[in-house]
Design a protein with these regions (language model features):
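Low-complexity, acidic Ser/Thr/Pro-rich repeat tracts that form intrinsically disordered stalk/linker regions
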Residues: 1-12
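Solvent-exposed loop/turn segments at secondary-structure junctions
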Residues: 282-287, 321-322, 346-350
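Hydrophobic/aromatic-rich core segments of domains that either
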Residues: 324-366
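LRR flanking "cap" motifs
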Residues: 11-66, 289
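Secondary-structure boundary elements
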Residues: 244-314
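Linear, non-domain "peripheral" regions
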Residues: 187, 193-257
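Concave beta-strand-loop units of leucine-rich repeat
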Residues: 50-59, 69-99, 105-118, 127-140, ...
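Non-transmembrane alpha-helical segments in soluble domains
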Residues: 25, 277-281, 330
Length: 366
């Protein structure tokens, strides 16, 4: 004679850390469900299908993988982080990111302005339809993009130190339902699989990018559009310079010509930098006219889209301000396979432009 036992998994109490428990209890209250404490049944946790986290100090998302019905997760931090010591920044960390990678039911994931993560692994999040990774200034690597085949929205830009995404062209081609594509300007060569040795590219990827009417963006002075916290399809608070694909093709082609004319093919990195600096010094003037315009992005060369702080205005129009020079230089360096990133640009009423230099973890005006 054998005994049968009832499966009590639904009644089992799952204890979560206080930070995560508080987030969940707040979300439950918004849904009209009263719950207190850090212990949850599976039935209660399964009520949480979406979560928006405005990161605070002491954040701890360990255990978030217990939200087995979680479909939409947005993690953001509203404060500008450039130039701040890490102790003055709130951000999720690598352990939190690993916990998020265990949320297998996610269809929408946004990671915005998190300074303590260096790697994001989405290889296990195969249900994703919408992915936004933006303004994470110390993010170096995104793993597993090639495992995603159901993406409808892909937004990756403003990640200042992100390594090249070698399979980005395949990601674009393999996601047949892709509808929204918003990427960093520096990712264009990766998106078309540009070969710096012979100048060839993936023409099929380029055709799809053009068909999607992709957006190509450059972040300005550490700002990020808070409207994108609400939805990645809304960018009314435009704190970046934006180009369409036709403009990117023009920018790319002229940049390739500049490299051909000013940088010897087989030279080292130092000679490449000198050649690029020589071109910018001789051919890009300061956009004095745009300085009096009220819009942060507007260029006297090409209005809103050109962006006085953008590489397009510098390379195509020969005029720029502030980050327009560095954005142009970054793109030219990218074509030579040289990695670079912007540092903080600080502006005030008495000093229009002040260089900020990090020394021994402190930020000192130079």
């Amino acid at each position: 004679m054998s005994l049968k036992t009832k499966d009590n998994n639904e009644d089992r109490i799952i204890i979560l850390n206080n930070y995560l428990a508080s987030l969940i209890n707040t979300r439950l209250a918004e849904m009209g469900i009263v719950h207190n404490g850090a212990g949850f049944t599976r039935d209660i946790l399964n009520q949480i299908t979406d979560l928006k986290i405005d990161v605070k100090y002491g954040v701890n998302l360990s255990g978030i993988e217990n939200l087995e019905m979680l479909n939409r997760l947005t993690i953001y931090y509203r404060r500008r982080t450039e130039g701040l010591l890490k102790r003055n920044i709130a951000s999720i960390n690598e352990d939190d990111m690993k916990a998020i990678s265990g949320c297998k039911s996610l269809t929408d994931l946004s990671i915005i302005n998190q300074s303590f993560i260096e790697e994001i692994d989405v290889s296990g999040l195969t249900q994703l339809k919408s992915l936004q990774i933006s303004f994470n200034q110390y993010l170096y690597k995104i793993k597993g993009l090639e495992r995603l085949e159901g993406l409808e929205d892909l937004v990756i830009y403003g990640n200042n130190r992100l390594y090249p995404l070698k399979n980005l062209n395949e990601v674009i081609l393999n996601n047949e339902s892709l509808d929204l594509l918003r990427l960093d300007v520096l990712m264009f060569p990766d998106a078309i699989k540009y070969d710096k040795e012979n100048g060839n590219c993936d023409i099929n990827s380029l055709k799809k990018i053009a068909k999607l009417n992709a957006e190509w963006c450059e972040q300005i002075n550490g700002w990020f559009p808070t409207s994108e916290i609400e939805t990645i399809r809304m960018s009314k608070d435009q704190s970046y310079v934006k180009y369409n694909t036709a403009q990117m093709i023009n920018l790319h082609n002229k940049s390739c010509q500049i490299i051909h004319d000013y940088v010897p093919k087989d030279c080292g990195a130092m000679d490449a930098v000198i050649g690029i600096e020589q071109y910018l010094a001789q051919n890009v003037k300061y956009d004095k006219k745009a300085k009096v315009l009220s819009s942060l992005q507007k260029s006297s060369f090409n209005g809103q889209i050109g962006g006085k702080n953008g590489s397009y205005s510098a390379i195509m129009g020969g005029i720029a301000q502030c980050e327009g020079y560095t954005h142009a230089m970054q793109y030219l360096l990218k074509l030579k396979g040289i990695r670079s990133h912007n540092v903080l640009c600080y502006v005030n009423n008495t000093n229009p432009i002040v260089q900020i230099v990090p020394i021994n973890k402190a930020i000192i005006p130079k």
